[in-house]
């Protein structure tokens, strides 16, 4: 049973193509190393071997200008290259902890591996895009050769695709490519190879009716009965009218039987089709599961039965399987927010209507989970560790009746998708069979009946089929001739007497890399990946991860330490570095795992880049992203001051009024490393500043250089102005998937209820306020804070002229402290009370992440500022009586970093007494 003390979460994040298995990770990292080492890059990469990488490394090792550390790193890369099998295959084993450690070490080495900028300045590598280009070129060549009946050269092209190291990333494409090879082998009269390739196509896509058809044709001479079984399977699985008629004709023209073809169709429909059981068997796999064993027994028994016997015994076996399911319901109850491990699946069979298969949880790994719906079964399969640790999903797929797919919610998406996923999946479930005789009316894509009504619909269809049997039989001969003419493009091999020139589009992958949209590959991945050790890849795929942990708000407060707080800040900084904005960050979405590590979940309103809908895969880009968790320089000793985090955030103020923010991602030891050595151009942000600051490189020396207490407050405000000016840069940010596009005027209307005499009044329905009280000294509890239940006192209440809003100056009662808390409504607040001699400067950061806007609250002794961060501008912010320039929301993590840096620079240390007193007992 699932441990009730652990919390299991699933949330959605729509992403683009990503790498997912450990061999591909190493392959990717080696490409990065190769890119850094390559000084003669010509736009082409050899994707089949890395022999030239050894030569590059050897030339660098012999170069006296490189340090011993770099040479040692190069030898490490060379060892990895020589020891690892770099080409991903479908039979690789699940990576163990040793491989994970190796990959993490590899990342650290690459981050510290520096060469001259000239070595890589012209290198613009996009692995997936390059892969697509290569496959497209090979596919085009293969088609041209096929048109010219040059089958030998066409075979060479598709064999190159077959040998590609990326070939295991899409089983849909493997199945298609194998089918092409089978056709070409048959053209070259190589029967064994044709059989082998067509069988491989069947294996990689169990629902590929055409693969079954070709395989049946190829083995007809050697094994007639098996060939007929495969031809019949292709006939049953086909949903298109013309192809179905053709497959039916092929099958019954070869089978010696007195039963008419359409009578056979009627019997197959009465079975509800055994394909439902086949699908379930494929997804369950050969485990010790009771249901799986029952299905296997059924499959063994029906192997040598006639179709009539199969239909007769089907209901008995369905009853047996349902009885097993009823028994399992008493031992385990599945919910949409819980997973099971492999061991738990074996010991506790599951509900057939909610199959959730966590393929790797027994290894204690986090990774990708793919979910799909086949018939009445919702299938969730987890695959190896991905770069997107901490990002999870429950979105299901709903067919819209076209080639596009919509992403439903976790609450009702599964129910909506149970019947809709049938027409494209060829799964031959109840609703799909209803449509077999109705495709001319286009009913196959409008199957909105619930599963509870499928049996009734099947009975109705059976009656219709009975009534139409005679007519269908009378027209059978006519249809046979027509189907031959209409389906010339679907024939394939050997002694086929149809015109081979008309076979091109259906037989070969006609520009499939250009024409296949996201939906085609996505649904096939859900259907095909039935073996946990076989890992596929999708485009704009749904990503999930199982996270074992406890919500921050429910975590034992006595166990909260400074390390947890620091890890959270670092985690948020990493999100900022990779430009990911959470937009719904609160205590329930921050999990603390058993080992004390943090994981932030619920990225349901985040998005990376554009909202791509049905883009050709040649237009999609790769995203290589990971949280770099190796922070060797941070010592989490509780006595140490929390300031090492700024090894990764260097803030330099100089006399030239240029503010340089260097996110030092490529070195974890030297906070003052040369920013020019950073290969990431986005890591250096240079913007104008109005600061008249001291040229010293850090805020600490800057603040110490001011002795006049009367100017301290103004100086601190100027520093904050400089920091805010960094945020007014013209860059892309993440937007909610379902957010509407608002112009400035519409945004104003959304945030503010109305405009009265140049005053903006808040729209209470869309913009929550900070809690406040009119009575002086009345304590206010700012919600259930995860780290501190802080009582605050409202010192004053001032009305700020537009575009400011009513806010109150808040002061934490008690000692000087740095307080971090998260409000229930998704607001992050960092409150930094800082004493500088006799003056106070209270800084508060409060972005409202779940809306289209944010706001930055700045509280001082004399003035209060509430700056809407909902609009876009290229100007500077001025904290005076003039209206503050509005700008669009940026990642809230930056505000956190700036507030922390401000605190560090002005006070020379973090003030963390409450954490030590309350949490480190």
From Swiss-Prot:
Residues 334-628 are annotated as: Kinase-like. Residues 401-499, 664-711 are annotated as: Disordered. Residues 401-494 have a biased composition (Low complexity). It comes from the Eukaryota. The kinase-like region is slightly similar to the kinase domain but does not correspond to a canonical kinase domain and is predicted to be catalytically inactive. This is Putative uncharacterized protein DDB_G0278921.
């Amino acid at each position: 049973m699932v441990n009730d003390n652990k919390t299991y979460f699933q949330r959605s994040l729509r992403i683009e193509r990503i790498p997912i298995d450990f061999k591909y990770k190493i392959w990717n990292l080696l490409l990065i190393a190769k890119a850094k080492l390559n000084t003669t890059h010509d736009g082409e990469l050899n994707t089949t071997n890395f022999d030239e990488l050894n030569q590059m490394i050897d030339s660098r090792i012999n170069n006296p200008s490189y340090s011993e550390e770099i040479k040692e790193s190069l030898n490490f890369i060379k060892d990895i290259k020589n020891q690892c099998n770099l080409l991903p295959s479908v039979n690789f084993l699940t990576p163990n902890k040793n491989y994970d450690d190796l990959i993490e070490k590899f990342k650290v080495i690459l981050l510290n591996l520096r060469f001259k900028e000239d070595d890589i300045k012209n290198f613009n590598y996009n692995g997936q895009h390059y892969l697509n280009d290569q496959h497209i070129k090979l596919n085009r060549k293969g088609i041209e050769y096929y048109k010219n009946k040059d089958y030998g050269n066409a075979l060479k092209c598709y064999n190159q695709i077959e040998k590609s190291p990326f070939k295991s990333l899409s089983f849909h494409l493997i199945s298609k490519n194998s089918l092409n090879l089978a056709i070409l082998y048959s053209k070259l009269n190589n029967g064994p190879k044709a059989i082998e390739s067509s069988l491989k196509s069947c294996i990689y896509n169990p629902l590929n009716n055409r693969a079954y058809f070709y395989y049946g044709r190829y083995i007809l001479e050697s094994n007639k009965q098996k060939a007929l079984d495969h031809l019949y399977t292709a006939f049953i699985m086909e949903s298109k009218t013309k192809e179905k008629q053709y497959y039916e004709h092929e099958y019954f023209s070869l089978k010696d039987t007195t039963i008419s073809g359409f009578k056979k169709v009627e019997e197959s429909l009465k079975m509800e089709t055994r394909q439902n059981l086949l699908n379930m068997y494929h997804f369950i796999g050969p485990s010790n599961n009771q249901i799986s064993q029952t299905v296997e027994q059924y499959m063994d028994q029906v192997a040598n039965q006639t179709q009539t016997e199969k239909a007769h015994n089907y209901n008995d076996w369905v009853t047996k399987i349902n009885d097993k399911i009823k028994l399992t319901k008493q031992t385990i109850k599945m919910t949409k927010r819980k997973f099971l491990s492999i061991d738990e699946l074996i010991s506790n069979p599951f509900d057939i209507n909610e199959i959730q298969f966590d393929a790797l949880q027994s290894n204690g790994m986090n990774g990708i989970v793919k979910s799909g719906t086949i018939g009445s079964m919702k299938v969730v399969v987890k695959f190896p560790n991905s770069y997107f640790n901490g990002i999870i999903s429950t979105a299901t797929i709903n067919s819209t009746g076209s080639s596009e797919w919509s992403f439903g919610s976790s609450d009702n998406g599964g129910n909506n998708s149970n019947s809709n996923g049938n027409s494209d999946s060829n799964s031959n479930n109840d609703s799909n069979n209803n449509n077999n005789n109705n495709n001319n009316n286009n009913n196959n894509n409008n199957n909105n009946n619930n599963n509870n009504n499928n049996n009734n619909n099947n009975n109705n269809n059976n009656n219709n089929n009975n009534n139409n049997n005679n007519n269908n039989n009378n027209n059978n001969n006519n249809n046979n001739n027509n189907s031959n003419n209409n389906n010339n493009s679907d024939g394939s091999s050997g002694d086929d007497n149809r015109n081979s020139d008309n076979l091109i589009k259906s037989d070969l992958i006609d520009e499939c890399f250009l024409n296949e949209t996201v939906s085609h590959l996505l649904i096939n991945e859900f259907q095909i990946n039935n073996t946990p050790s076989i890992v596929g890849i999708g485009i704009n795929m749904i990503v999930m991860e199982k996270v074992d942990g406890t919500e921050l708000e429910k975590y034992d407060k006595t166990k909260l330490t400074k390390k947890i707080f620091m890890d959270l800040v670092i985690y948020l900084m990493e999100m900022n570095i990779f430009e990911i904005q959470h937009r719904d960050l609160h205590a329930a979405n921050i999990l603390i795992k058993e080992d004390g590590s943090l994981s932030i979940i619920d990225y349901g309103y985040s998005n990376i880049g554009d909202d791509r809908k049905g883009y050709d895969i040649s237009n999609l880009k790769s995203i290589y992203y990971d949280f770099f968790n190796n922070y060797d320089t941070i010592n989490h000793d509780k006595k140490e001051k929390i300031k090492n985090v700024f090894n990764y955030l260097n803030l330099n103020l100089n006399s030239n009024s240029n503010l340089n923010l260097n996110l030092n991602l490529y070195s974890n030891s030297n906070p003052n490393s040369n920013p020019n050595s950073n290969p990431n151009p986005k890591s250096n942000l240079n913007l104008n500043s109005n600061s008249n600051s001291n040229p010293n490189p850090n805020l600490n020396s800057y603040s110490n250089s001011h002795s006049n207490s009367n100017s301290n407050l103004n100086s601190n405000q100027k520093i904050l102005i400089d920091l805010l000016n960094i945020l007014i840069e013209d860059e892309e940010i993440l937007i909610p998937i379902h957010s509407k596009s608002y112009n400035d005027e519409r945004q104003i209307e959304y945030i503010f209820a109305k405009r009265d005499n140049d005053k903006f009044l808040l729209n209470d329905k869309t913009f929550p306020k900070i809690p406040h009280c009119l009575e002086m000294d009345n304590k206010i509890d700012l919600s259930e804070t995860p780290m501190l239940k802080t009582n605050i006192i409202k010192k004053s209440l001032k009305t700020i002229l537009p575009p400011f809003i009513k806010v109150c100056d808040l002061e934490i009662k008690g000692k000087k402290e740095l307080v971090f808390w998260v409000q229930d409504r998704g607001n992050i607040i960092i409150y930094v009370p800082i004493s500088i001699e006799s003056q106070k400067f209270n800084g508060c950061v409060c972005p409202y992440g779940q809306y289209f806007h944010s706001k930055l609250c700045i509280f001082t002794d004399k003035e209060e500022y509430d700056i809407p961060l909902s609009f876009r501008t290229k100007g500077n912010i001025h904290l005076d009586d003039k209206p503050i320039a509005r700008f669009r929301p940026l990642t809230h993590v930056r505000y956190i970093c700036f507030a922390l840096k401000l605190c560090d620079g002005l006070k020379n240390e973090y003030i963390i007494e409450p954490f030590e007193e309350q949490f480190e007992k």
